Curated annotation (Swiss-Prot):
Chain positions recorded as Mg(2+) binding sites: T26
Keyword Magnesium: yes
GO molecular function: GTP binding; GTPase activity; translation elongation factor activity
Task performed by this protein: GTP hydrolase that promotes the GTP-dependent binding of aminoacyl-tRNA to the A-site of ribosomes during protein biosynthesis.
Family under the similarity heading: Belongs to the TRAFAC class translation factor GTPase superfamily. Classic translation factor GTPase family. EF-Tu/EF-1A subfamily.
InterPro entries per record: EF-Tu_GTP-bd (IPR041709), EF-Tu_GTPase (IPR050055), EFTu-like_2 (IPR004161), EFTU_2 (IPR033720), G_TR_CS (IPR031157), P-loop_NTPase (IPR027417), Small_GTP-bd (IPR005225), T_Tr_GTP-bd_dom (IPR000795)
Location of the region described as G3 in the Swiss-Prot/TrEMBL record: 81-84
Location relative to the cell: Cytoplasm
Enzyme Commission identifier(s): 3.6.5.3
Stretches for region G5: 174-176
Enzyme class (EC, first level): hydrolase
UniProt-recorded name of the protein: Elongation factor Tu
Region G4: start-end pairs: 136-139
Length: 396
């Protein structure tokens, strides 16, 4: 992928295709790169190259994901497409490819299918902010009424999972026709309409630097004559000298004031999202803070023990468990920088969980962690990853 020709002046948005197997997600991805490449807005990536996506490791889990990029007049898009259903589930739960918006692909010939429903539910659970719909294979349906029926079904399904089904743009077309006739204005109209819908409907994400300050603590040092320094990578926002901050998690929340910020031994006025910094804290002893806590803007995040989550349990082949587990299972939950033991309670009617399953369950931790909806974690047994999850709701 030639990086030079992309101007980074345009705002950047992350998207991905979701939908049932064989409804045309990968064909659409290829068609978009082909059609847009003719206008210099993308490099054409062929279907075969997207379909045999390389496997990547994210939190110890192997996920096959294809990444393509393209532009519209207004934006630069990074777009992910996964070859298999299991890859989608893992991708969305681990947040390996964070999505600011999703392109739901539904075959007009089949209408919504089980994985259509599952992907919409997952998008809702993991907090994908918005969805646009591409109704594919419309060339295979002669009956206008049938197309309308499928559209209504899709809108109903989106409403069921609390997406605004009545307002979501649904673009009709054929990805295959567009891919095979990339210069045909009529057959590629749907691709340009989709891009327009993405520009107009998917909101631009808030930049990490504009969010309230948060830094997971990785290490704690005592510097004689100066006090206690905690180090870590700023996850979001900025931190300045004289800022009042809170230390959240594991024990009672404490307030303190930043008396110094340094990076690579140099003194800074402020640290911002992405920086690895040392933060000097007023009146805090080395024993008052520990790895696993976070520094945060006061009131922006609170500690919790009980939450609901969506989790994927690794297969034996992925290095996970060899046997099922039941309600009352007590693994460690690795949040940001530390493990905390917790108890899993399975949903009613669920007897047990097999390796390879994805589940919704309740967790009760033995210590509180600074937590919010959308926080990712790994499930571990003695340092070995056996699952991955995302907080979908805080209970207390």
């Amino acid at each position: 992928m030639s990086k030079q020709k992309y101007e980074r002046k345009k705002p950047h948005v992350n998207v991905g295709t979701i939908g049932h197997v064989d409804h045309g997600k990968t064909t659409l991805t290829a068609a978009m790169t082909h059609v847009l490449s003719l206008k210099g807005y993308a490099d054409y990536i062929e279907f075969g190259n997207i379909d045999k996506a390389p496997e990547e490791k994210e939190r110890g889990i192997t996920i096959a994901t294809a990444h393509v990029e393209y532009e519209s007049d207004k934006r630069h898009y990074a777009h992910v497409d996964c070859p298999g259903h299991a890859d989608y589930v893992k991708n969305m739960i681990t947040g390996a490819a964070q999505m600011d918006g999703a392109i739901l692909v539904v075959s007009a010939a089949d209408g919504p299918m089980p994985q259509t429903r599952e992907h919409i539910l997952l998008a809702r659970q993991v907090g994908v902010p918005s969805i646009v719909v591409f109704m594919n294979k419309c060339d295979m349906v002669d009956d206008e009424e049938l197309l309308e029926l499928v559209e209504l079904e899709i809108r109903d399904l989106l409403n069921t999972y609390e997406f605004p089904g009545d307002d979501i743009p649904i673009i009709k077309g054929s990805a295959l026709q567009a891919l095979e006739n990339a210069e045909d204005e009529e057959k590629t109209k749907c691709i340009w309409e989709l891009l327009q819908a993405m520009d107009d409907y998917i909101p631009a994400p808030e930049r990490d630097i504009d969010k309230p300050f948060l830094m997971p603590i990785e290490d704690v040092f005592s510097i004689s004559g100066r006090g206690t320094v905690v180090t870590g990578r700023v996850e979001r926002g900025k931190v300045r000298v004289q800022d009042e901050i809170e230390i959240v998690g594991l024990t009672d929340t404490r307030k303190t004031v930043v008396t110094g910020v340094e990076m690579f031994r140099k003194i800074l006025d402020e640290g911002e999202a992405g920086d690895n910094v040392g933060v000097l804290l007023r009146g805090i002893k080395k024993d008052d803070v520990e790895r696993g806590q976070v520094l945060a803007k006061p009131g922006s995040i609170t500690p919790h023990r009980k939450f609901k989550c969506e989790a994927y349990i690794l297969t034996k082949e992925e290095g996970g468990r060899h046997t099922p587990f039941f309600s009352g299972y007590r693994p460690q939950f690795y949040f940001r920088t530390t493990d905390v033991t917790g108890v899993i309670t399975l949903a009613e009617g669920v007897e047990m969980v097999m390796p390879g399953d994805n589940i919704s369950c309740d967790v009760d931790l033995i210590q509180p962690i600074a937590m919010e909806q959308g926080l990712r974690f790994a499930i571990r047994e003695g340092g070995r990853t056996v699952g991955a999850g995302v907080v979908t709701e805080i209970v207390e």
